[in-house]
Amino acid sequence: EPLFRSRSFHIGLGVAYPYGNSTVLPFEKRYFSGGANSVRGWTVRSLGPGRYKDKDGRINFITQTGDLKLDLNLEYRTHLFGKFNGAAFIDAGNIWTLRDYEEQPGGKFTWQGLITDLAVSYGLGLRLNFDYFVLRFDCGMKAINPAYQTEDEAHYPLIHPDFSRDFAFHFAVGMPF
């Protein structure tokens, strides 16, 4: 089997807007962020929208959805040995709402807040390549958490990591992009 090294880059952008007599998108049509195919430092549906943070700090699948999504992924892939491949990655992205919603403070998209609202994570992955499909195990860590806007430990977990808060483990079938 030939040795390989590659760099893969992915940009994902989505915008959804309610039309007709609807003022809000149906829940199943809204975007979510975090998880094995998004910003891998967050568990699935636990990121955003924007700077939004649930009052009790828990994940809320209903309010952590949005109308706009941006994913930026950079991955370095290499062969390790046998059927095992490795990856190192950096992910950035978030979701936002197009309107202000009382139950999602800090979630509305603004051009001025685009950079400060981006969540950033990094990590390592192990892939088991069976030729017809790939089993993937990724460990991501938050580097910048937009839900915390002050210069405290939670905003920059890269400097002050908390294992229970800032790491996410993912098992998936297939490549992330």
Feature-to-residue mapping (PLM):
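C-terminal outer-membrane beta-barrel translocator/porin domains of Gram-negative envelope proteins
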Residues: 4-78, 88-111, 154
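Transmembrane beta-strands of outer-membrane beta-barrel proteins
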Residues: 5-11, 86-90, 124, 135-137, ...
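Transmembrane beta-barrel architecture of outer-membrane proteins
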Residues: 67-71, 119-123, 166-170
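Extended hydrophobic/aromatic segments used for targeting, binding, or gating
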Residues: 109-124, 128
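Outer-membrane beta-barrel "beta-signal"
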Residues: 126-133, 163-177
